[in-house]
């Protein structure tokens, strides 16, 4: 082998790797690959771990929001369930009839939840609502990052709530006793209060228990809200101190100011003098002095005087005797501010000039001669120019209102005793007319009639009252919101202040069950407030029968009206020779006659009556309106739909006194007043009062009386005497008995034919069987049996009380 071959061989060995080195290199590459793959796996695991850590925070926020909303919804559901709790709903604590409609707003489940809560804890169950609200508020602030390092401890709050729901019912039971038994399952405090309270009272006594319970409740409330009472008191003290400092600074600043007798450039002394003189100025034109810039006469200003009220805030100084009826006092009503209506004569002058200029734009020449301002409107009296017709001015009422930017303008074509016309404009600021102003006025106090009613104030601010005995009936109409119901309430309240139950009695018919039901139970009522229209027909039938009875009594006594009858009865009793009842059920020993009260029938909504019992109601109202005045029976009929099918010609012809509040159309105004104008009123008590024999109505602002005032007066009246109802008035029995007393011929009874048929078919002649069959009272059944005897249907009763049937079907 040569040297070259050795070199090639060595080179070849050196250039080609050996199998062992190749295997080692492959192993190294595999190890490096494993490490890379392990690193990649570690990175992926780390990413997964970070993703898992980040995802729960977002999910937790969503879950927290959902739980917060669910808690809010549950709290609101619990609130409406507790508010609408009704003892008549199905419940867990007591049995109740099966009802289809559950009154609870939360449904059947809400009714059970509210019942269980009130049964266990009484009113203290509302602490659960308070705790839920506190927890929701705290969690909301914490979640919204509005608080730093603040965490609401729910465990402490739960413990505080537990203590509250145990101790609060005990306090409720001790303070309220067994009250609210009608509105709560077991009364105030629930079963927890009753049971735990008994243990506390036995161990610590009532006084000691109250002291400990109050301390525990304060601590529990502090833990529930998680506030410190000391910090709260310190904060309240600082707030009061800051407020006092601010007030003292204002007082010192006011003290440094110089007194100024003039305000805003107006001489207050001169203004007082002008207002004082304006009150005494009559509505007569006053000529302007020569050289005035205007040829128009100056406006004579008539200002509504301030209400002068003299009210006794306490009861009468005389000692009150037991059983004596006392009329309500004015301290039960709200007393208004005795501030006069602010009138600016310059403003009246500007308005008068504006009226003249606006009418001149329409080609109408007028001259304003005077102005009268009242609580709601101001009337400007105008003299039309020569050749101008009043109808031309009346036709421009809407155009004048639009040009003056007013809600409405009412034009009075004729003013009694004057050759002027009236333009009534609404005031910028309304003045409330309270019922107490009218009742405290001399015109009401000096009125002798027991049926004096407060109507309101006229355009000059003068109180206006009416005598229902002279009207003698009143028809009231007005749309919703016009003040009709308030006006009727004011009339009823006026009579309650004026008369006792022995002098005036009421029959109230309230189809809406809202307006007059507040008077239910007063001693002036002859029957409960009528809400069923069928019973309303029976009540009117009784009134007609009572009217006929009274006319018989008046005729027998030889007098012309109820007032004369009562005077004669009183005089005979004073002379020791009382008048005897000529229609007594015991003719051998008749009872003496007593004074008869006047009766006022109040119908709140005539439209409902006419829809249900049209013929009977229309005839009965017409009969009462025609004849009932002398018998002392009067009516106040109200409706919010004065259409011709409700206020018929028969009713209108017999009720000449009308009072119209705001109505919807000119047709309604013509229906109620026989003229237009009620459609242009301003609502809220603005009305037109048409008296008998008067062609032009009087514009009034009705007296306002609130529900609270009515409640106070009704409660006072109920304390004076209990309700005294006429038995059977709403069933028709009282009317029939009254008719039988006046006319003993009971065969006029509408059930006479049915009684004859029943006796002939059943062969039963006892009064009790007739009473059961016809479903009537015993007295009426006895009268029917006597009528059957007089008609020859049955024989007189024998010694055993039985009767024989004398007639047969063939003979009838």
From Swiss-Prot:
Superkingdom field: Bacteria
Stretches with biased composition (Basic and acidic residues): 25-36
Binding site for ATP: 481-486
Residue ranges that the UniProt entry lists as topological domain Cytoplasmic: 231-812
Disulphide bonds in the chain: none
All residue ranges annotated as the FtsK domain in the record: 461-670
Protein's UniProt keywords contain Zinc: no
Subcellular location per the Swiss-Prot or TrEMBL entry: Cell inner membrane
Biased composition range(s): Basic residues: 1-11
Region (Disordered): 1-36
Transmembrane segments: 63-83, 116-136, 156-176, 184-204, 210-230
Membrane topology category: Multi-pass membrane protein
Subunit structure: Homohexamer. Forms a ring that surrounds DNA.
Name used for this protein in its record: DNA translocase FtsK 1
Organism per entry: Neisseria meningitidis serogroup A / serotype 4A (strain DSM 15465 / Z2491)
Gene from which the chain derives: ftsK1
């Amino acid at each position: 082998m040569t040297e070259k071959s050795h070199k090639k061989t060595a080179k070849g060995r050196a250039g080609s790797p050996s199998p062992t080195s190749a295997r080692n290199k492959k192993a190294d590459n595999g190890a490096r690959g494993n490490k890379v793959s392990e690193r990649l796996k570690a990175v992926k695991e780390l990413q997964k771990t970070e993703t898992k850590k980040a995802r729960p925070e977002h999910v937790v926020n969503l879950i927290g929001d959902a739980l917060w909303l669910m808690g809010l919804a549950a709290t609101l559901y619990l609130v409406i369930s507790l508010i609408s709790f009704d003892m008549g709903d199905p419940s867990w604590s007591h049995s109740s009839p099966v009802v289809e409609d559950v009154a609870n707003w939360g449904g059947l489940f809400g009714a059970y939840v509210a019942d269980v809560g009130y049964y266990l804890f009484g009113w203290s169950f509302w602490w659960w609502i308070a705790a839920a609200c506190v927890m929701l508020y705290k969690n909301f602030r914490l979640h919204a990052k509005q608080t730093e390092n603040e965490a609401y401890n729910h465990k402490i709050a739960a413990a505080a709530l537990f203590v509250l729901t145990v101790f609060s019912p005990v306090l409720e039971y001790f303070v309220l006793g067994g009250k609210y038994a009608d509105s709560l399952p077991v009364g105030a405090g629930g079963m927890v209060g009753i049971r735990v309270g008994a243990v506390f009272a036995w161990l610590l006594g009532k006084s000691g228990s109250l002291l400990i319970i109050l301390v525990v409740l304060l601590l529990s409330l502090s833990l529930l809200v998680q506030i410190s009472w000391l910090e709260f008191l310190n904060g309240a003290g600082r707030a009061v101190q800051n407020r006092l400092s601010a007030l003292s600074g204002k007082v010192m600043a006011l003290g440094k100011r110089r007194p100024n007798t003039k305000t805003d450039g107006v001489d207050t002394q001169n203004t007082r003098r002008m207002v004082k003189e304006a009150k005494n100025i009559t509505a007569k034109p006053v000529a302007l002095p020569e050289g005035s810039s205007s040829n128009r006469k100056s406006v004579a200003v008539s200002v509504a005087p301030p209400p002068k009220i003299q009210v006794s805030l306490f009861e009468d100084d005389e000692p009150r005797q037991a059983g004596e009826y006392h009329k309500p006092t004015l301290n039960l009503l709200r007393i208004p501010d005795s501030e006069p209506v602010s009138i600016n004569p310059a403003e009246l002058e500007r308005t008068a000039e504006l009226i003249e200029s606006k009418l001149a734009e329409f080609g109408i020449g007028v001259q304003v001669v005077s102005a009268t301002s009242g609580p709601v409107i101001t009337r400007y009296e105008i003299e039309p120019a020569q050749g101008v017709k009043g109808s031309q001015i009346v036709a421009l009422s809407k155009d004048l209102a639009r040009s003056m930017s007013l809600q409405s303008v009412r034009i009075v074509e004729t003013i009694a005793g004057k050759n002027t016309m009236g333009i009534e404009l609404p005031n910028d600021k309304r003045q409330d007319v309270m019922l107490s102003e009218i009742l405290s006025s001399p015109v009401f106090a000096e009125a002798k009639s027991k049926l004096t009613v407060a109507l309101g104030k006229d355009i000059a601010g003068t109180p206006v009252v009416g005598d229902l005995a002279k009207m003698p009936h009143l028809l009231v109409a007005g749309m919703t919101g016009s003040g009709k119901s308030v006006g009727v309430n004011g009339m009823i309240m006026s009579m309650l202040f004026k008369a006792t139950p022995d002098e005036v009695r009421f029959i109230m018919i309230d189809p809406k069950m809202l307006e007059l039901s507040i008077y239910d139970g007063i001693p002036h009522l002859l029957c409960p407030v009528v809400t069923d229209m069928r019973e309303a027909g029976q009540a009117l039938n009784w009134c007609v029968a009572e009217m006929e009875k009274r006319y018989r009594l008046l005729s027998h006594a030889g007098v012309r009206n109820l007032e004369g009858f009562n005077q004669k009865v009183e005089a005979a009793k004073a002379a020791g020779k009382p008048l005897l009842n000529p229609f007594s059920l015991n003719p051998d020993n008749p009872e003496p006659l007593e004074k008869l009260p006047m009766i006022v029938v109040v119908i709140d909504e005539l439209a409902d009556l006419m829809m249900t019992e049209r013929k009977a109601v229309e005839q009965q109202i017409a009969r009462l309106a025609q004849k009932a005045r002398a018998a002392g029976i009067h009516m106040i009929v109200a409706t919010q739909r004065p259409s011709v099918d409700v206020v018929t010609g028969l009713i209108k012809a017999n009720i000449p006194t009308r009072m119209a509040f705001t109505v919807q159309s000119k047709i309604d105004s013509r229906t109620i007043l026989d003229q237009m104008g009620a459609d242009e009123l301003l609502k809220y008590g603005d009305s037109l009062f048409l008296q008998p024999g008067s062609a032009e109505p009087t514009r009034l602002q009705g007296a306002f009386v609130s529900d609270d005032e009515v409640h106070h007066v009704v409660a006072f009246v109920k304390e004076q005497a209990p309700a005294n109802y006429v038995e059977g008035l709403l069933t028709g029995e009282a009317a029939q008995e009254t008719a039988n007393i006046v006319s003993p011929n009971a065969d006029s009874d509408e059930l006479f034919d049915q009684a004859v048929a029943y006796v002939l078919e059943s062969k039963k002649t006892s009064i009790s069987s007739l009473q059961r069959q016809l479903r009537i009272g015993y007295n009426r059944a006895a009268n029917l049996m006597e009528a059957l005897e007089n008609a020859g249907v049955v024989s007189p009763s024998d010694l055993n009380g039985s009767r024989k049937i004398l007639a047969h079907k063939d003979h009838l």
